[in-house]
Amino acid sequence: MEIIPAIDMQGGRCVRLYQGDFQRVTVYDDDPVAVAHRWVAQGAPRLHLVDLDGARSGHPVHTDIIRAIVQSVDAPVQLGGGLRSIAAVERALELGVQRVILGTAAVHDPELIRQLVQQFGDAIAIAVDARNDMAATAGWTETAAISAIDLVERMAALGVRRVIYTDIARDGTLSEPNIATTRALVRPGGPAIIASGGISTIDHLRRLAEVGVEGAIVGRALYTGDLSLSDALAAVQ
């Protein structure tokens, strides 16, 4: 199971939101590139970048920072936030991002997802962000009329091979991940599942590994020191 540090960017800084609320933001560093270097130096196998301003505006905003990270770290990068067109996905991949993550488009434009999967295959991942088990869109500011489980099934039917599942109510809270829903999403022959939201202890990571997820994205717990990356990596070897 991969342990993937999250780097959420807002206004050029590295931040964390509480339950996806843009009004409840904590700034952890003014230099996301330096943060990326720190996590990779500590052994991160991959980085999870989120362009929060992009998620709200509908188009990537932190392009220069993303490019600087991709060009200067020796680890693959996945990127989400504001990627809602073929052109936006192509631009992200041209930056050197290995994997792009689409969320809003998965709900509102499944035909786009089908085309992207046909064209880019494993480079496409879907963010299934859920509030009260219903999918959220537009930077988590809107709730759609489809459940997380149904959305994953819909994406699987389109050929999607990887889903990042986040329980918004737990994100940034240091509480615990939603093990029950995560378990329901992990199915033989289904998309690989990467878990996110509320992961803050070694026990959480071990429970997720038992469920069978491909990876776990850790954010606030790494920044507060509640969880050390080296301990997390060692726990799932």
UniProtKB/Swiss-Prot annotation:
The keyword Cytoplasm applies. The keyword Isomerase applies. GO terms for cellular component: cytoplasm. It is an enzyme of class 5 (isomerase). The active site is at residues 8, 129. Keywords: Amino-acid biosynthesis, Cytoplasm, Histidine biosynthesis, Isomerase. Pathway: Amino-acid biosynthesis; L-histidine biosynthesis; L-histidine from 5-phospho-alpha-D-ribose 1-diphosphate: step 4/9. InterPro entries: Aldolase_TIM (IPR013785), His_biosynth (IPR006062), HisA_bact_arch (IPR006063), Isoase_HisA-like (IPR044524), Isoase_HisA-like_bact (IPR023016), RibuloseP-bd_barrel (IPR011060). It comes from the Bacteria. Disulfide bonds: none annotated. Its EC number is 5.3.1.16. It catalyses: 1-(5-phospho-beta-D-ribosyl)-5-[(5-phospho-beta-D-ribosylamino)methylideneamino]imidazole-4-carboxamide = 5-[(5-phospho-1-deoxy-D-ribulos-1-ylimino)methylamino]-1-(5-phospho-beta-D-ribosyl)imidazole-4-carboxamide. It is found in: Cytoplasm. GO terms for molecular function: 1-(5-phosphoribosyl)-5-[(5-phosphoribosylamino)methylideneamino]imidazole-4-carboxamide isomerase activity. GO terms for biological process: L-histidine biosynthetic process; L-tryptophan biosynthetic process. HAMAP family: HisA. Belongs to the HisA/HisF family. This is 1-(5-phosphoribosyl)-5-[(5-phosphoribosylamino)methylideneamino] imidazole-4-carboxamide isomerase. It comes from Roseiflexus sp. (strain RS-1). The gene is hisA.
